[in-house]
């Protein structure tokens, strides 16, 4: 990320948001990147003072940025810039607020892509099958006792040499097999939990083990703006989580260095090196699972859409789904009723004789 002479002002603004708005770390990171890129562009144009930036300058910046970014991204960038200049004006850094009338680009209301219920079931079945076919009983990497079989009658040196050369690859194979099994168990648990709860991928990767309440079959989720909610999950997700925590997680945890292990000690899901899993890996797990299951390619967010739509199809109340998804506005949740209507039209056309 390019640095600018305005980095100090950006830092102060982000600190203000963190203290007063309760925005998530991901949102703050995105705002910081948006502001740095915007002000770096003005710096390249010779701007040395925030007071030199006008509304026309900001509109010109938006025109440049909109060539390479979707409207949803531009909407976020505009909110960040408008918020920054409002803060700068309130704190006496500028004599005017040039962004006060800067318009946020309208975002077209598109129907989210979703899997059918049978496709979702197929996705989860394939993940469960992968656990079964990759099943490997991990023994913690213990080696067989030396000095047995043909090596017993030879000298200690020869015996040790034989064991070292023959058993080292075997131990490596055991570790590799155990890791593959552990990752399959983790992937199945991730897919089950995403679909069962409709949580966001950012919420998933930030979860700790303590956030799961198996007795009530619920999870505590920290969403946007650090707002917390409690979401229920079903028996298939419980089984997948228990298998991962009891069998798979200890295997991946052993691969971590002491420093990584300390940072990820409470993390629910781990990566291949034993650290807390990141969003990129979680997204890749979902995309890869969709390919292997032969269903339409989806993202974790599309799996969230699918969960919401299937709940509404099953008779759930709209406000219940709103609470589950952590939407601040009911209008956001209402998008999923449109999807259900489209599915109803398709079913009607296929099943009704006078369609």
From Swiss-Prot:
UniProt biased composition (Low complexity): 141-154
Active site per UniProt: 200, 224, 301, 304, 327, 336
Similarity-based family: Belongs to the 'phage' integrase family. XerC subfamily.
Domain of life where this protein originates: Bacteria
Protein's recorded name: Tyrosine recombinase XerC
HAMAP family tied to this protein: Recomb_XerC_XerD
GN (gene name): xerC
Domain Core-binding (CB): 4-89
